[in-house]
Amino acid sequence: MAAIEAVNAREILDSRGNPTVEVEVLLEDGTFTRAAVPSGASTGAFEAYELRDGDAGRYLGKGVQKAVAAVVDEIGPAIQDLDAADQRIIDATMIELDGTENKSRLGANALLGVSLAVAKAAADSAELPLYRYLGGPNAHTLPVPMLNVINGGSHADTNVDIQEFMLLPVGASTFSEGLRWGVETYHALKSLLKKKGLSTGLGDEGGFAPNLDSNRAALDLLMEAIDAAGFTAGKQIALGLDVASSEFYSDGAYTFEGQKVDAAHLTAYFADLVASYPLITIEDPLDEDDWAGYDHFTAELGAKVQIVGDDLFVTNPKRLADGITRGVANSILVKVNQIGTLTETLDAVSLAQRSGYTTVLSHRSGETEDTTIADLAVAVDAGQIKTGAPARSERVAKYNQLLRIEQDLGAAAVYAGRSAFPRFQA
């Protein structure tokens, strides 16, 4: 029994200079932990509600003092004296206290900060690393890092439509080797961009943000960088995309590469990319409400490539269940702040894995130095993690935590590699 003695919160800054919530939890046995909440740029319409102050005269309306007050004045007293190990009870207490479907009264950012800080405190009190506390003795698989090395869309002020172009070191034998491959290719890409007179400025997630002639041009750059770094595209390093189509969808049409197109056009476009490049995962290829489009996209490409639902599923077990029933997509992106509590996140992961959907743990574009998602990826055997380029300390912090976990596991550590992508043919 390690009862919660005190809960505190404050407003801190995320990696984009916007306020976010940090929560501290003190247990009666003296255990003290803190957790910080991330924030997205391209957000799904069905995500849990991020409570902002709306005061234009302070942080341009993006302050989170209301969420901080919710933690200190309401949530803290409601969970005081509860056992920190009773995560499900604590999360359910907060959800009931909020009383809304999307956590809009207290704010998902308030609930999540408490939920994560409590889990960390319970793990520390039990003298276990977080990945072991959450995942048990079978938590030993390190995820494939999906390194977002070219940023476009909402993550960069450029003319590139697709939001993320990723390197996936699937052929490595260990996580540390895979990360090294990705880092070396990242630096090769920087040299290439300089040589071609293109910008090496960074986007929100640490990737380069050059203006390019087309989305294909970005993929061509990645292929060239992989070769320049001494690796084999497809066999050692594969490619992935986060299209974030909802960002360029309006009034029933997609504005893509300067044209108004429909879902059938995009499906054919991505089918051509899959045939032309070692492209093994595509996230959010269509709008979050384009269910008919997803029916067609999945029928055409579902057997060939991982189709990841981010805005489509928003880490919500109910939306995921709808998708599973319809048979759309075959993977879920897992972002803890989309649903607002650790328990609901774990429920979404469990449902996905039971249903044969792969799982991808993910950061947000507005991040902090908090490394919880690294432990969570190992705890739930996600097999894949998205946490940006190997640049900017808020991104690298997660990779460094995974390196620590790999070392901690020693000979028991297993790298997911190709096995994380059951549709990958190479």
Swiss-Prot record:
Its cofactor is Mg(2+). Pathway: Carbohydrate degradation; glycolysis; pyruvate from D-glyceraldehyde 3-phosphate: step 4/5. Keywords: Cytoplasm, Glycolysis, Lyase, Magnesium, Metal-binding, Secreted. Gene3D superfamilies: Enolase-like C-terminal domain (3.20.20.120), Enolase-like, N-terminal domain (3.30.390.10). The keyword Secreted applies. (2R)-2-phosphoglycerate binds at residues 163, 335, 364-365, 386. InterPro entries: Enolase, Enolase-like_C_sf, Enolase-like_N, Enolase_C, Enolase_CS, Enolase_N. Binds a second Mg(2+) ion via substrate during catalysis. GO terms for biological process: glycolytic process. It catalyses: (2R)-2-phosphoglycerate = phosphoenolpyruvate + H2O. The keyword Lyase applies. Mg(2+) binds at residues 242, 283, 310. Pfam families: Enolase_C (PF00113), Enolase_N (PF03952). Its main location: cytoplasm. One of its GO terms (molecular function) is phosphopyruvate hydratase activity. It is found in: Cytoplasm; Secreted; Cell surface. GO terms for cellular component: cell surface; extracellular region; phosphopyruvate hydratase complex. Its EC number is 4.2.1.11. The active site is at residues 205, 335. HAMAP family: Enolase (MF_00318). NCBIfam families: eno (TIGR01060). Belongs to the enolase family. Catalyzes the reversible conversion of 2-phosphoglycerate (2-PG) into phosphoenolpyruvate (PEP). It is essential for the degradation of carbohydrates via glycolysis. This is Enolase. It comes from Clavibacter michiganensis subsp. michiganensis (strain NCPPB 382). The gene is eno.
